[in-house]
Amino acid sequence: MGVFSPSTTRLTLKWFSLSVALFLLFHWGIPSVDGHEDNMYGEEIQQQRRSCDPQRDPQRLSSCRDYLERRREQPSERCCEELQRMSPQCRCQAIQQMLDQSLSYDSFMDSDSQEDAPLNQRRRRREGRGREEEEAMERAAYLPNTCNVREPPRRCDIQRHSRYSMTGSSFK
């Protein structure tokens, strides 16, 4: 039997064919990301970040303010629709922003009206304002749930950013 016998040639062809088939399977079977696809993914992430950007839409969720400020018992239909349409990753951030704007405006208005008031009257107002702020934060945290938003999060972790948010205050 020589080196190029028919059985050796067939065996070599089988191994070569198997190798080519495996190479093609791995080459086309494993997903790869080329520069164009990677750039498209990056643009999608940037677009999502921009969609959460508070500067893009400063009046976002303004229809929910009356509910948070206790001028309404339930959020308006428009408020709930806006929340429902909003992307889940932006929802709590938008609620926090709207609450912060509302509280900072109220704090500014309070500071103007309290300048000439007696000290103990200003303290009572601050205590009352602190309770109102607590209620607004609670309403804000559960706003997605109150509106029956289907996608999570249905509760937001709301942070305090107001000058009235002192812990262990001496105003009692």
Swiss-Prot record:
Keywords: Seed storage protein, Signal, Storage protein
Ranges in a coiled coil: none
Domain of life assignment: Eukaryota
UniProt signal peptide: 1-35
Molecular function via GO: nutrient reservoir activity
SMART domains associated with the record: AAI (SM00499)
Biased composition (Basic and acidic residues): 151-160
Location of the region described as Disordered in the Swiss-Prot/TrEMBL record: 108-172
Residue intervals passing through the bilayer: none
InterPro entries (UniProt xref): Bifun_inhib/LTP/seed_sf, Bifunc_inhib/LTP/seed_store, Napin/2SS/CON
Similarity comment: family membership: Belongs to the 2S seed storage albumins family.
Protein name stated in the entry: 2S seed storage-like protein
